[in-house]
Amino acid sequence: MADGQMPFPCHYTSRRRRDPFRDSPLSSRLLDDGFGMDPFPDDLTASWPDWALPRLSSAWPGTLRSGMVPRGPTAMTRFGVPAEGRSPPPFPGEPWKVCVNVHSFKPEELMVKTKDGYVEVSGKHEEKQQEGGIVSKNFTKKIQLPAEVDPVTVFASLSPEGLLIIEAPQVPPYSPFGESSFNNELPQDGQEVTCT
């Protein structure tokens, strides 16, 4: 998939199913991507009880956050989420994984591609006649790949809830030929060697 395009969806039957809510770093990022769309229409919030409005309009300090959280650097560091446009660093041995909320787009309206060390996710709705006007939604999100990830191994899947899960295994570290962690020198005359 490096420097090429692959129409969505892409499925790998040999891949086991994963639970995106299992990993705590992942669950803190699930609702980060709102693409500038309000999570609730203005007329809907007018009928909410007084006790619910502060919870909907302020930053929630829980694991999952609403789409109304300010996107400042303090919010990012407080929740352990990397700066905007950067992908989270993978843990050693864990696959690199990012979720993008695309619930308002159909699978055929999404495109996932890799180019120049980035994964680019884009979506576009066809124009629709709605409320006396024409409505069209589109977005593009670029996510930088970590150095430990090979762009050819990136794959994406769409959950029933509308989360686009982008994953790639880490490239195992390698050592140049002749370098290794064990000592490959022969013992000198003064050294004792035990063979078993």
UniProtKB/Swiss-Prot annotation:
Kindly list the positions at which Asymmetric dimethylarginine occurs in this protein.
Answer: 71, 78
For the sHSP domain, which residue ranges apply?
Answer: 74-185
Please list the residues that carry the modification Phosphothreonine: 63
The family database entries (Gene3D superfamilies) matched by this protein are listed as: 2.60.40.790
UniProt PTM: Phosphorylated.
Q: Give the GO terms filed under biological process for this record.
A: cellular response to unfolded protein; positive regulation of aggrephagy
**Pfam families hit by this protein:** HSP20
Could you give a GO molecular-function term held by this entry?
protein homodimerization activity
Q: Where is this region: Disordered?
A: 1-34, 176-196
- Ranges annotated as biased composition (Low complexity): 23-34
Q: Where Phosphoserine occurs, residue numbers?
A: 24, 57, 87
Q: Where in the cell is it found?
A: Cytoplasm; Nucleus
Q: Give the compositionally biased regions (Polar residues).
A: 178-196
**Could you name the Gene Ontology cellular component terms for this entry?**
cytoplasm; cytosol; nucleoplasm; nucleus; protein folding chaperone complex
Q: Which UniProt keywords apply?
A: Chaperone, Cytoplasm, Methylation, Nucleus, Phosphoprotein, Stress response
The primary location reported for this protein is cytoplasm
- Which superkingdom is the protein from? Eukaryota
Q: Point out the signal peptide segment.
A: none
Extract the coiled-coil ranges from the record: none
Do you know which SUPFAM superfamilies this protein is assigned to? Answer: HSP20-like chaperones
Query: How is the subunit organization of this protein annotated in UniProt?
Result: Monomer. Forms a ternary complex with BAG3 and HSPA1A. Component of the chaperone-assisted selective autophagy (CASA) complex consisting of BAG3, HSPA8/HSC70, HSPB8 and STUB1/CHIP. Interacts with HSPB1. Interacts with DNAJB6. Interacts with BAG3.
Protein function: Involved in the chaperone-assisted selective autophagy (CASA), a crucial process for protein quality control, particularly in mechanical strained cells and tissues such as muscle. Displays temperature-dependent chaperone activity.
**Family, per the entry?**
Belongs to the small heat shock protein (HSP20) family.
Q: What is this protein called?
A: Heat shock protein beta-8
